[in-house]
Amino acid sequence: MAARSVSGITRRVFMWTVSGTPCREFWSRFRKEKEPVVVETVEEKKEPILVCPPLRSRAYTPPEDLQSRLESYVKEVFGSSLPSNWQDISLEDSRLKFNLLAHLADDLGHVVPNSRLHQMCRVRDVLDFYNVPIQDRSKFDELSASNLPPNLKITWSY
């Protein structure tokens, strides 16, 4: 017999034995053994995760016929009859504004960033945005290409 003390109370615990084996071992023979479930694993090829996103090329030069392209898209989105001052058309309707900017982004390959969307109030603002050329050079590239004083040098390998 074994004695066990639980929080100050002494109880006697009997270990049942059936034909020389403890109770747990006796009844375990009658339990059905569960077969291990085998889960099929499907290997998917995943692209490697980049630590930082690749630099995107942002170079943009406005085309020569930008004004005529913009005018044709404005006619397509706002209707064929345009006033003489078509550049002063308001872009308050967000659906029309989206359609116009989406057509221009597809055609020119240059998208208006989210931070500048609220500044596009009139067609003139869109024309001014697309008239600005963007170079794909960093400030360090510009500094190394410019004429530097003799005491200033940019060394890329350090």
From Swiss-Prot:
- Listed GO cellular component terms? cytosol; mitochondrial inner membrane; mitochondrial large ribosomal subunit; mitochondrion
The GO biological-process annotations, alphabetized, read as: mitochondrial translation
Where is this chain primarily localised?
mitochondrion
Has the keyword Ribonucleoprotein been applied to this entry?
yes
Q: Where in the cell is it found?
A: Mitochondrion
Q: Which UniProt keywords apply?
A: Mitochondrion, Ribonucleoprotein, Ribosomal protein
This protein's record includes keyword RNA-binding? no
Q: Which family does it belong to?
A: Belongs to the mitochondrion-specific ribosomal protein mL50 family.
The UniProt subunit note reads as follows: Component of the mitochondrial large ribosomal subunit (mt-LSU). Mature mammalian 55S mitochondrial ribosomes consist of a small (28S) and a large (39S) subunit. The 28S small subunit contains a 12S ribosomal RNA (12S mt-rRNA) and 30 different proteins. The 39S large subunit contains a 16S rRNA (16S mt-rRNA), a copy of mitochondrial valine transfer RNA (mt-tRNA(Val)), which plays an integral structural role, and 52 different proteins.
Protein's name in the database: Large ribosomal subunit protein mL50
